Amino acid sequence: MAHGAMGTTATDTNMNTKTMPTEPTTTVAFDPGTFERLHRAYRRIDPGDPAQAWHLLEALHVLGQTRLVPHARTHGLMLALAWRTRNLAEVNGQLLRLLLVPLGHLLGRLPLGNTGRSHVGAFRPMQVAPELLATIRAHQRPPTL
């Protein structure tokens, strides 16, 4: 395991780099099923409701940011939404973040809990907002008995 200023890096059996928190930042454990259910919910969003689309993408980012592929995939979706909504500041922010994702995973320096949007510092760890946590939990599969 390598240690970075914002977390500890390890590799799981799927060869996905993951970062585990070492600071008091609230994080959400990655679950591929929950990630895919959130992604499906995002794809079903009404194109005329960008606020809900951004909310789901922020939830996807918080959930997937400790894994390289889901993290990059989420920033790609954010870039596409920024382009569709003609938000040039967000387009530029997402282009920068897409370049930083591999480097952050390689160095194990990911700002856990960060929502991934351009109006938030790219290196700023954050507490997970209660509404994002509620959205993530709503898409978790209930335990089977």
Which residues are covered by each model-predicted region?
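N-terminal alpha-helical interaction modules that lie
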Residues: 2-7, 11, 15-65, 85-145
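Internal catalytic or translocation cores that form aromatic/hydrophobic pockets or channels
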Residues: 78-85
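TPR repeat positional signature
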Residues: 37-38, 71, 75-78
